[in-house]
Amino acid sequence: MFIRLTPDISVAGQIAPEDCALAATQGFVAIISNRPDGEAPGQPDAAAMAAAAAAAGLRFCHIPIDHSGFAMPQVEAMAAELAAGGPVLAFCRSGTRSTNLWALAAASHGTDPDSIVAAAAGGGYDVSGMLPSLRMLADKA
C-alpha cells in the first residue's frame, strides 16, 4: 500500500483517515496530501485527513497539486516538509503527483537527478521525462 522510494519518503494512492494510524505504526512521522479537496466523490478532505493524522501523532501538510501542474511554491513547500524530518508518506490519487513533486523537491536541494529517477523507478514510477527539469533544479541548488 505504501511504496518506499527512499528511507525518508514513501508514496501512496488515496489513503483513508484510518490509514494514518497504520502509517504511524510503520514509523512515519508525517503525512503529505497532494490531492486537492473535492477531486473525486467520496474522497476524504484535507481537514479529515489532518484530524486523523493528528490523532495518530503525525504531522500533516496539504500541498494540493491539480491538473494545471507544478509551481515552485509547491516544490518549496514539499522540500520544507521533507526537511522537517521523516520518514514521510505522501499521497495523491495514484502516487504519481506525489512522486513527481518529491522528485522536483529533492532536485531543488541538490539530489543527483539520476538517483532520483532510479529511486522513483524502484517504486514503479517513471520520472525520466522530468530529467531536464531535475537537472536544472539540481544545478541551481
Give the residues covered by each predicted segment.
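Short cysteine clusters
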Residues: 92
